[in-house]
Amino acid sequence: DNFLDPFNIINILRSIAIVTVIAIGVSISLTIGGFDLSVGSTASLANALVISLFVWHGLGTTEAILITLALCTLVGLFNAFLIVVLRIPDMLATLASLFVIQGVAMTYSYGGSITENMVLPSGEMAEGTIPAAFGALGQVPTIVIIMLVVTLIAQLALSFTTHGRRMYAIGGNPEAARLSGLRITRYKVAAYVIASLLAGLGGILLASRIGSSQVNAGGGYLMDAVAAAWIGFSLAGSGKPNALGTLVGAVILGVLSNGLVMLSVPYYAMDIIKGLVLAGALALTYFQRRT
């Protein structure tokens, strides 16, 4: 098989699109000195919500997507409440949130998959269908275009707007940012809401791609998203988290995974390679900070 075959390149781009969107949310939480571990569970929740709105309630594409994204903002507000109001450290707060949201998603979906023509707990048959327009979102080129648009908007917002520079200032030195009059609380809330929105968008794209809701479908994207964010931070981020670097990190992971498959490396060994790459990226990041 030829690695540079156009179909293989398209497959890589399709495979990294969801990871990239979720990882940019992680990167935005990193800009303010935080860290969001709940993005995988949020993606799972969005996956279940959007499919259920089609299959159980018969809503259209636009309504289902908007309702799902609106509900995902509640996850960001919940994270912000734990971190800003209760002052729980970011990683511990979002770890707790990970389990809460995962439980909510499992409970909402009755612990199973949501598909067309499924049998409801009441014994009736679900009559709703997934619109063709929604299914197109998860296909090439639409999913790749969405990934690139999200990357571009996030990169421009972080690099060329006052709010982006303020977020970097808060992440770099919170005390100095506070003394200079920046509203740290407001930016922390915004960062976690945006991270949850992007995780929700990732879950929606996943739902479009697979055409159903699977139990904890977004959970597998957490570590890849974290790895992409940190790899981009260290290798292509100029010493700070950014969307373009995150895209580069996702591409590196996508190429690595694709190459391992072509080399017939067992799937259960791939996490070892990814873990070593992430460890190297983290080591490089902290080495750069010390120097």
Regions found by a protein language model. Give the residues of each.
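Single transmembrane alpha-helix segments in multi-pass membrane proteins
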Residues: 1-57, 82-88, 227-243, 276
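Interfacial loop-to-helix junctions that mark the boundaries of transmembrane helices
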Residues: 3-14, 58-63, 131-145, 213-220, ...
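Hydrophobic core segments of alpha-helical transmembrane domains in multi-pass membrane transport
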Residues: 25-26, 98-105, 146-156, 195-202, ...
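Alpha-helical transmembrane segments within multi-pass membrane transporters and channels
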Residues: 58-99, 248-249
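Helix-loop-helix "hairpin" substructures at the membrane interface of multi-pass membrane proteins
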Residues: 59-68, 74-79, 136-213
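Transmembrane helix-bundle core of multi-pass membrane transporters
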Residues: 90-163, 187-190, 209-218, 269
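Cytosolic-side transmembrane-helix boundaries in multi-pass membrane proteins
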Residues: 152, 179-186, 256-291
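Transmembrane alpha-helical segments in multi-pass inner-membrane proteins
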Residues: 199, 209-275
